[in-house]
Every structure is written in C-alpha cells, then in structure tokens.
C-alpha cells in the first residue's frame, strides 16, 4: 500500500462537540464498542483476499471498468477536476494511490469468484498497513460517514441529557459484555488490544445510555402511529410481476396479449422467451416521477410499457399492501425517520461535522 502522506486517515478530525474534537479513529472505535465493525472488517478481508487471488492468477485488470467506477465516484461527490479530487482525498488523509488501489480492489472482488481465502485476522491485532488500508476503504465506500453520524448523534444526546442514572449505565455495560462475548475480568485485556482505557469505556457507556434514553422517549407508540399516517402512501408495498422486452412494439404486443387475449404475464414471457420475474418494493423507493404511474393503477392491472435501459418493461401490479406497524420493515423505516429528524436537529445544537486534517 502506498503511504497516505504525513497524516494518517485515522487522525483526521471528523466532528466536534463543545471544545472536544473527535477523529476517524474515535468514530471507528465507537463502532467497535457497539459491535458494528466486525462485519465490515470481514468484508474488507475478503476484498483483500480477492485482490491477492487476482495477483496469483495474473488477472489482467480491466482499466476501462476501473476508470468508469472512479469517474462515477467523482460524479457522485461533485469532484470535477483532478485538483478537487486531490483536495478531497488529502482532507481525509488519502492520496491518489489509495484512490486507485481501492477501485482496483473492488474490480478484483467482482472478477474473482473462486479460490478466495480471507485471512483470519482480528481488527485489533492487524498491522498498521492493513488497518490504514481498511480505513481508506471505509472512507471511500461511505461507511465511515455512517459511523460519524452515529457518533455525533450520541455525542449530542450526551450533551443534551442529564447525567445518566447508574442503572442505565449498568444496563449498557451488560449489553456491551454480551455483544463482545467476554467476562468482566476480560475487559482490561480487550481495552489494551484496542488501545483504549477504562475512562474511554466509561464515557462510551455514558454516551450510549444517554442515546438510548432519548430513543426510548422518542419512539413511543403514539409517535410511531403519527409518523405512519404521514408516510402512509410512501410505505405502501407493491408486489409486481414484470417482463423485460427489447422494444416498445414488443411491449405493446405483450400488453395486448394479456389484456385482450387473457394470457397471463408468465405465459407471454414463456411463449416469447422474455425474461420474467417478481419484485416487491415500497412506493417511496421509486423515483419521484415514476410513483404516480403506480398509484394510479389498480391492483391486478397493467402499467403502460416503461423504458428501461435499451429496452422496455411491462409491469402488472399483483398486490398493494397498506403499511402496518406490525411489519418489521415498515416499523424500522418509521423509527429511522423519527430518529433522523430528531437527532439532525439535536446535532446542530451540540455536535458539528468538522472534516479536516490535524494541524
């Protein structure tokens, strides 16, 4: 891995609360505390193993595909020039080499399907080079942004709340031990491996207790029900069947076969050998300009042919299901909306994003 320069990506300042500044390492270690890093670490090790396997196979990288992926990234982040990209990377402790290596590694993941054997390495015991490669992947994949948001929400909750009760902190300590699968006597060793101390752990427990206290107050049954009414249409679940066709004429012909001849969608697809599949989604998942088409069509009816890529899709609505709080996905989305709205406002008062390299 190429050097990231004089500033490690671990040391970039990502947010501040009061006079205290927090680094990328703080956000990552907080994710370790919450038990949210392990899956990302395992995925990263798989990516590294795929890259190593590609080297063993002497796989020729598709530079065009890698370049397209990098350009799409720059477009999403509004990085028009090379100078803007370099500044964006430098502010995060990264270089163009890190940038290029990341997209080459992602290509290897998609190109190598067999013979990939990730190493069994714990995050806390990995060497610095591997860890900094991991941080680069967290930054470029957007995963670090999510960790920063989760940290700032908790910092804001801590600042806005009274000192958590000892019972609440004790409850978080029990959850922490359960998440890690360790005994109280093993905590000191765990902290040493992470490079933290008991003061840090106590602060994490207090922050989490304050955050959970806010969440419990916010996610009362009445609040969920009010939010459900506001999101009734967007959280309507659609079950559809669709056929993929090569042209508008073919789509219109298939439409007539269903409407006029009484054939099923699957029969039309089988007869003409068109791809056929079922799909489920919430209305809010569709682009805004596509939503009215689905709202205006009754259950059991077909939509007019829809352009999709180089061809068209013919879609029939099998079922429309109104949202209910008993649906775990609906409930999760409602709770996430409530949390995002509340903590977005709270963080403007107490915690502030501050992405920069330390001076």
Show where each model-derived region lies.
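Short aromatic-centered micro-motifs
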Residues: 15
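Peptidyl-prolyl cis-trans isomerase
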Residues: 1-12, 20-359
């Amino acid at each position: 891995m190429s050097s990231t320069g004089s500033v490690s990506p671990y040391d970039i300042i990502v947010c501040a609360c009061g006079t205290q500044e927090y680094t990328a390492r703080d956000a990552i270690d907080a994710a370790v505390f919450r038990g949210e890093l392990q899956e990302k670490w395992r995925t990263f090790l798989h990516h590294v193993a795929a890259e190593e396997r590609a080297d063993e196979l002497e796989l020729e990288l598709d530079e065009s595909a890698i370049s397209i992926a990098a350009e799409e990234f720059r477009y999403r982040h509004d990085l028009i020039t090379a100078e803007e990209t370099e500044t964006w990377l430098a502010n995060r402790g990264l270089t163009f080499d890190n940038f290029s290596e990341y997209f080459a590694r992602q290509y290897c993941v998609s190109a190598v399907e067999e013979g990939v054997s990730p190493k069994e390495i714990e995050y806390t015991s990995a060497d610095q080079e591997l860890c900094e490669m991991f941080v680069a992947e967290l930054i470029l994949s957007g995963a670090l942004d999510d960790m920063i948001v989760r940290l700032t929400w908790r910092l804001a909750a801590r600042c806005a709340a009274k000192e958590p009760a000892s019972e609440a902190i004790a409850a978080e300590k029990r959850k922490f031990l359960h998440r890690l699968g360790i005994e109280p006597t093993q905590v000191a060793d765990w902290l040493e491996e992470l490079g933290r101390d008991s003061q840090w752990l106590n602060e994490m427990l207090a922050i989490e207790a304050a955050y959970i206290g806010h969440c419990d107050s916010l996610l009362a049954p009445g609040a969920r029900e009010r939010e459900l009414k506001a999101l009734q249409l967007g959280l309507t679940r659609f079950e559809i069947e669709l056929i993929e066709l090569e042209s508008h004429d073919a789509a219109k012909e298939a439409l007539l076969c269903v409407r006029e001849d009484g054939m099923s969608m699957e029969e039309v697809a089988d007869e003409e050998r068109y791809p056929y599949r079922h799909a489920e989604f919430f209305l809010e998942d569709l682009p805004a300009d596509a939503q009215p088409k689905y709202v205006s069509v009754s259950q059991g009816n077909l939509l007019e042919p829809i352009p999709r890529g180089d061809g068209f899709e013919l879609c029939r609505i099998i079922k429309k299901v109104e949202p209910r709080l008993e649906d775990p996905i609906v409930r999760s989305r409602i709770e996430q909306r409530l949390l995002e709205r509340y903590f977005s406002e709270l963080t403007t008062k107490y915690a502030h994003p501050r992405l920069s390299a330390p001076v």
